[in-house]
Amino acid sequence: DWLLRVLFTPGHTMTHLCLLLEKKGDPYAIFTGDCFFNAGVGNCHNGGDPEILFQTVSTLFEKFPDELLIYPGHEYLKHNLEFTNHYEPMNLAALAFSQKLKGVNLDEVFFINTMNVEREINTFLRLTSKNLLKQLKLEEASQKEIFLTLRELRNQW
């Protein structure tokens, strides 16, 4: 009843893979390595391509069910939430999650989010947020342009 499926997820690197765990044919959990993180996505410094990463995220991760569990390769949650809160300061879910992290040692605690939580706190999945677009001054930009702008801003963060 359990199946582990290998998914080709280029972008962070051109050969990146994720592992999707299915239960009775339905997505249950994904092990994302460095492609997708709590509140963020991977960088493209090691031979990756941000445009391909956009395609991977927009065609794969956005289609997963809300209850899918996400196991990233390692933790950037606090830093990623700081980025989200800076560029989307009216994101109440991200602000609340940041409050939840106060006093938490992320070297000892690892958060396993669901896709639903990620859709609320992950700036790279919120490319239609009016508050984000206004903050970035990209109200007329395509989702791809917004993603690429965010990826470049996150590279400098």
Feature-to-residue mapping (PLM):
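Accessory terminal helices/loops
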Residues: 55-69, 77-157
